[in-house]
Amino acid sequence: QGLTTPYTVAVDINGNEQNGTGILALSTFGPITAGAGYFNNQNINTNITNANFNPGLLGSVVRYSAGSLGLTGGEDLYVATVQGDLDFVKLESWYLGMQDTFNSYTLAATGKIDIAENAKIGLEARYVNLKLDNELASDDDRKNSMFRLAVDGKVSIVNARLAYTQTGKHGGLTAVDQDAKNASLGWFLTSNGVPDAKYWQAALGADILDNLNFTLNYGNLKTDLNNSPVEFKNQEVYGQLTYKMSKNLTTYLRYGTYEQKVESSGVKQTDNTRGRIQVAYTF
């Protein structure tokens, strides 16, 4: 069964999914939805080291830390949620606990505002707190957190988004998949697992046709890994042309640049240019 939580991705078009053996049940009472779940095994151990894929030295440091959790896939997993739909705003609270590994909670509020017939704005505020078990880390090193504020909108054919994410100074591991809601993801960049990160994301695009859109994306992530002598500055710019052929068939062309620099020395650790074409059909 797929693990449908803001920490995980239950269904992924590229096959990188989290699932387990167990049950997750939800019940709705008017505007309130409550649920709980238990899984006696899962495949989080195969995904956690890829939960951060930042290139260069920064990514190597973060992935090493995630790999040191020593997961086997046999750990028990506990899930609970309470959600409220108040029409103008949706509220979510989640708990996720893994046996002898971590305990975490998420608080989120999202809303949609129709300001005109062809103008809509979306808002999000999200906070995640994850604390590692005593056996895995000590004192402040156990603490991981992030908060994100985001606004997106579409006016006629123009779409835009602006988001700011900041992770805790001791740790930023708040999801077990880089595509999960509890991680802020660009293309080359992700906040997940990065301590003391300050991450800005911006996007501006337009519909060329009803089913053809071009969007330019920008990302800037800075961190000194909690006052270490090394301060990283990461920046990416990429454009994406998306063509939705049908309800189930989508293709995109993406091209952009990524740069990682050590601020103290001015040395570029990474300077990449890359492109990607993807054609995907969902059933």
Regions from the language model: what does each represent?
Residues 28-31, 83-88, 97, 113-117, ...:
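Outer-membrane beta-barrel strand-turn architecture
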Residues 1-10, 34-37, 80, 88-99, ...:
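Transmembrane beta-strand segments that form the barrel wall of outer-membrane beta-barrel proteins
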Residues 23-25, 34, 80-82, 91-93, ...:
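Membrane-embedded beta-strands of outer-membrane beta-barrel proteins
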Residues 1-54, 82-89, 153-170:
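Outer membrane beta-barrel
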Residues 4-10, 42-46, 97-103, 115, ...:
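Gram-negative outer-membrane beta-barrel proteins
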Residues 17-21, 28-30, 74-78, 85-87, ...:
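Residues that define the transmembrane beta-barrel architecture of outer-membrane proteins
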Residues 80, 202, 243-245, 271-283:
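Outer-membrane beta-barrel "beta-signal"
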Residues 85, 110-224:
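Detector for outer-membrane/organellar transmembrane beta-barrel domains
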